[in-house]
């Protein structure tokens, strides 16, 4: 691109570089800065950025696996499947979102298995983790809300308020000023007009979201390579087997509906959160890349990429967290 076309972002002008919070690219920036200090070529600098991004992803992935009480192998499997490994070794932020989501799920599972109330430092760390997820992409931070459903025996109301407070303060002090002054997002259509169309026809908009989600799920069977379809089927079967084993070993028979919901609250939450996160990024793509007014009633949103689903995968492991209310300490059999 000619230098005359490069836009330096400030209070009045923005470009593609500030579509994301600056700290989102800190892993890549570390590698690039080191490469610049040792006078490597521009190409080598980009490769160094990829390497540093991969290293930090691996560190956070190992932390999530170590923190998870059980089913560590399943978490490791999710973190190394080819699509995730690809984005983790690229310059994109998707790999870090996967790692942060995995750490959040592992932290919730570990807290649920505690025999005492979570400490204040751990609460602060959990709030920072939720803030980091929200800074990456707000839709992927929905999983952090699952912490509010932890039993009071391990996370009291006060701790939950502190958790929300830490995340809110960080958002207000660090993220919101940047968002107001510098944040921007590219769009091929008039987003304001799309919003008015969506609000005027909510049922049709919801229908487009649902159809786009179904299309995204069935796309593997028709367009992607066979190995990708096989991998997806294997992952689903492994998760279902782990879920059946967990339910069977925790005795779910002959329970009142209220007791069942309390015991398997995180299974319900995992399915709801996963659907909400997918619907959120589908809606975002629909609002920014599609003209809702000119779309047919049964059309699907264009521009949805499969990599958007990858950060949702760790959320399903949240469904393996089981709350045992038979003891005062309320433990969890997490994956």
Protein language model features and the residues they cover:
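Transmembrane-helix signature of polytopic, membrane-embedded enzymes
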Residues: 40-43, 62-82
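Specific aromatic-rich, kink-prone transmembrane helix
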Residues: 63, 98-115, 126-129, 316
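Membrane-interface alpha helices of multi-pass inner-membrane proteins
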Residues: 86, 120-138, 143-152
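Short acidic/glycine- and proline-prone juxtamembrane loop motifs at membrane-interface regions
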Residues: 90-97
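Perimembrane helix-loop-helix junctions
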Residues: 107-117, 141-169
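Hydrophobic alpha-helical membrane-interfacial segments at the cytosolic entry of transmembrane helices
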Residues: 122-130, 156-181, 266-276
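Membrane-lumen/periplasm interface segments of multi-pass, membrane-embedded glycan/lipid transferases
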Residues: 164, 168, 175-256
